[in-house]
């Protein structure tokens, strides 16, 4: 048996460089690089290995550990989970910074390999810099906090443990049903320790991503339900995207006259113009999809995990005879809502089910309902994209501090409404441009309003809805598809939370366009707060008022364009639609990352359509408005499904 004496870190780099995946006969390299922010717990171990021989791995320099891990997540998502960039950090705060990103990847079922440094396995110098000491367990370190948010976790306390740790890491990372974040903690002394690693550990490994078919019994159980239903609706989830089953789903839906509602993860898997595509469904869904869903007697969940936003907290489907059928690689997700399930690959299962339904001569009983619903939404879209600020302007959102809008208007001199801005952006950017989003009111507006004919051009992280994902993810998406324009669409709140990877985009010459919607606050949470009878507390960006000692002073103005220009971005400020249009046109000509500071009037985002969201309201309050909100919530909850 041949072996090579190497340090643990050197062996790790060599192993990662030899990982490949195969899908539909196409073989691709799996690990394309590694993000790192070197600290004392990683630089002389893994850092030495990468300096001496990085092999085929490109080393990227992050600016914030959470940010670089979000970029890696987006890179994997935009590559349909078949390519990754690993992330390494020092011990302590560097590692802890990646926990949020790990949770984001796991919730969204995106492969993310994290390699945080750790304290000494020998414990000789304990407590080392940045080490947490727990008197009840000296084996606990910061990295233990990754356990709840990862799909696989391991710590390499001896060099030879690296082999089983990495084999299992790859097992999870390349499993479509179980993938998510993987954490392999690397004690800093072990990184530099050597071992005679067998050559077979470094052999080229091709991880086959297969298309398993559900068992025949499951198909026929589902068939017996479907063929007796008159008004089914399909929910298109992220599984459609990752199975590359968009065309198959479109063919299926059009053949059997079944309308489709899109989740955030499923959007852009099929064309917006598809005759059966109603658009976004659920809490952030549009009028067309939610109206059809209310009367549906069958819900066919395809590659979806049925989040509360998709099901409107299980209140959306009001037909008393409604049943659920699912297609999903994950038995866990397929079993939700007492569904009759087909556990298997989306594309393969749809093709098999197509043949069975065709033999039954099945067709839904919809007549003009689908067309009428789409037409009604088309008319609503015209209104939304043409909302203009005028004298005595009344914004879409009615629950508000009436003075805020005029105060913001006076402060910024803007006339831009959020929905009209989105309409203009859609008109101006390339048809195949990738948009990236995650948090605030914009994901709701985008799920409702954004239309695209370009496959996988809608990149929304709405499983964890992580503020700060957008810009880092825009960079990651650009790394994945450098030939396309990428637009990170986010609010001022999210921008302030995390935008450090803009510098990395400059460093790597990978252009990201930032569309920053500034409404001087956390707008969507202000909506949620005030619509449930609560006062306007700490959701607008205001100075502290010396007289009241509360955060109800004047609005805080920020020149985001000026600040970003200091980083080296090409920047613009838009206060009217003409300025926005000119900025969008000019930004396309730039080779460097850009930022458009769009001053948007508060409360001009879209509102909900025929949906409800269950949030934890106070049962008792001195304010009648809060009590009323609780009673309304209680009333809807009675009719919602219990699990």
Curated annotation (Swiss-Prot):
- Does Metal-binding show up as a keyword for this record? yes
- In terms of superkingdom, the source organism counts as Bacteria
Q: What does this protein do?
A: Involved in the cleavage of the C1-C2 bond of 3D-(3,5/4)-trihydroxycyclohexane-1,2-dione (THcHDO) to yield 5-deoxy-glucuronate (5DG).
Q: Which HAMAP family match?
A: IolD (MF_01669)
Cofactor detail note: Binds 1 Mg(2+) ion per subunit.
- Which Enzyme Commission numbers does its entry carry? 3.7.1.22
Tell me the residue numbers annotated for binding Mg(2+): 492, 519
Record-annotated residues binding thiamine diphosphate?
Answer: 65
Q: Which GO terms describe its biological process?
A: inositol catabolic process; isoleucine biosynthetic process; L-valine biosynthetic process
- Name the UniProt record assigns to this protein: 3D-(3,5/4)-trihydroxycyclohexane-1,2-dione hydrolase
InterPro entries in the record: DHS-like_NAD/FAD-binding_dom (IPR029035), Myo_inos_IolD (IPR030817), THcHDO_hydrolase_firmi (IPR023757), THDP-binding (IPR029061), Thiamin_PyroP_enz_cen_dom (IPR012000), Thiamin_PyroP_enz_TPP-bd_dom (IPR012001), TPP-bd_CS (IPR000399), TPP_enz (IPR045229)
Which reaction is recorded as catalysed by this protein? 3D-3,5/4-trihydroxycyclohexane-1,2-dione + H2O = 5-deoxy-D-glucuronate + H(+)
* Pathway terms, separated by semicolons: Polyol metabolism; myo-inositol degradation into acetyl-CoA; acetyl-CoA from myo-inositol: step 3/7
- Gene field: iolD
From the UniProt record, which GO molecular function terms apply?
Answer: 3D-(3,5/4)-trihydroxycyclohexane-1,2-dione hydrolase activity; acetolactate synthase activity; flavin adenine dinucleotide binding; magnesium ion binding; thiamine pyrophosphate binding
What does the record give as cofactor? Mg(2+); thiamine diphosphate
Q: Name one Pfam family in it.
A: TPP_enzyme_M
What are the start and end residues of every segment in region (Thiamine pyrophosphate binding)? 441-521
The family assignment reads: Belongs to the TPP enzyme family.
PANTHER family from the entry?
3D-(3,5_4)-TRIHYDROXYCYCLOHEXANE-1,2-DIONE HYDROLASE, THIAMINE PYROPHOSPHATE ENZYMES
Q: Might you report a single GO cellular component term?
A: acetolactate synthase complex
């Amino acid at each position: 048996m041949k072996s090579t004496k190497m340090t643990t870190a050197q062996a790790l780099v060599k192993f990662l460089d030899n990982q490949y995946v195969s899908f539909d006969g196409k073989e691709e390299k799996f690990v394309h690089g590694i993000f790192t922010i070197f600290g004392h717990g990683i630089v002389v171990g893994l850092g030495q290995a990468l300096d001496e021989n990085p092999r085929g791995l490109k080393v990227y320099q992050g600016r914030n550990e959470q940010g670089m891990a979000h970029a890696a997540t987006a890179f994997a998502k935009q590559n349909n989970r078949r390519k990754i960039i690993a992330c390494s950090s020092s011990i302590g705060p560097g590692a802890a910074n990646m926990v949020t990103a790990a949770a984001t990847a796991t919730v969204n079922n995106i492969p993310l390999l994290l390699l945080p440094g750790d304290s000494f396995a020998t414990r000789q110098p304990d407590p080392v810099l940045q080490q947490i000491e727990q008197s009840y367990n000296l084996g606990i370190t910061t990295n233990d906090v990754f356990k709840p948010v990862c799909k696989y976790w391991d710590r390499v306390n001896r060099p030879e443990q690296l082999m089983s740790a990495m084999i299992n890491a790859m097992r999870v990372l390349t499993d479509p049903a179980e993938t998510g974040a993987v954490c392999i903690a690397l004690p800093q002394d072990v990184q530099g320790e050597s071992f005679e690693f067998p050559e077979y550990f470094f052999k080229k490994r091709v991880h086959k991503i297969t298309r398993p078919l559900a068992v025949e019994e499951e198909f026929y159980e589902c068939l017996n339900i479907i063929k007796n239903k008159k008004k089914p609706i399909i929910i298109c989830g992220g599984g459609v995207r990752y199975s590359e089953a968009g065309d198959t789903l479109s063919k299926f839906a059009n053949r059997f006259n079944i309308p489709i509602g899109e989740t955030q993860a499923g959007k852009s898997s099929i064309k917006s113009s598809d005759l059966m595509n109603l658009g976004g469904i659920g809490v952030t869904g549009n009028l067309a999809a939610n109206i059809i869903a209310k009367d549906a007697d069958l819900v066919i969940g395809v590659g979806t995990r049925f989040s509360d936003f998709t099901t409107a907290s299980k209140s959306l489907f009001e037909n008393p005879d409604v049943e659920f059928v699912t297609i999903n690689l994950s038995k866990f997700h397929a079993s939700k809502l007492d569904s009759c399930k087909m556990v298997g690959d989306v594309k393969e299962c749809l093709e098999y089910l197509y043949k069975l339904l065709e033999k039954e001569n099945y067709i839904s009983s919809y007549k003009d309902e689908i067309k009428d619903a789409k037409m009604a939404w088309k008319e609503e879209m015209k209104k939304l994209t043409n909302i203009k600020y005028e004298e005595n302007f009344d914004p879409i959102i009615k629950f508000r501090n009436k003075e805020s809008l005029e105060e913001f208007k006076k402060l910024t001199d803007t006339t831009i409404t959020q929905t009209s801005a989105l309409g203009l952006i859609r008109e101006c950017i390339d048809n195949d441009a990738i948009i990236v989003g995650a948090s605030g009111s914009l994901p709701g507006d985008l799920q409702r309003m954004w239309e695209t004919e370009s496959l996988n051009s809608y990149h929304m992280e709405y499983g964890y809805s992580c503020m700060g994902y957008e810009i880092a993810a825009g960079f990651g998406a650009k790394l994945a598809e450098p030939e396309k324009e990428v637009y990170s669409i986010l609010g001022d709140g999210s921008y302030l939370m995390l935008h450090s990877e803009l510098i990395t985009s400059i460093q790597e010459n990978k252009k990201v366009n930032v569309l920053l919607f500034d409404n001087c606050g956390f707008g969507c949470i202000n909506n949620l707060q005030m619509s449930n009878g609560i006062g306007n507390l700490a959701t607008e960006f205001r100075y502290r008022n010396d007289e009241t000692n509360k955060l109800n002073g004047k609005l805080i103005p920020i020149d985001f364009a000026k600040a970003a220009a200091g980083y080296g971005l090409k920047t613009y400020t838009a206060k009217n639609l003409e300025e926005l249009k000119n900025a969008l046109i000019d930004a396309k000509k730039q080779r460097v990352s850009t930022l458009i500071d769009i001053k948007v009037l508060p409360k001009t985002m879209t509102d909900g359509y025929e949906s409800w969201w269950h949030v934890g309201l106070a049962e008792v309050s001195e304010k009648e408005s809060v009590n009323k909100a609780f009673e309304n919530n209680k009333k809807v909850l009675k009719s919602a499904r219990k699990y």
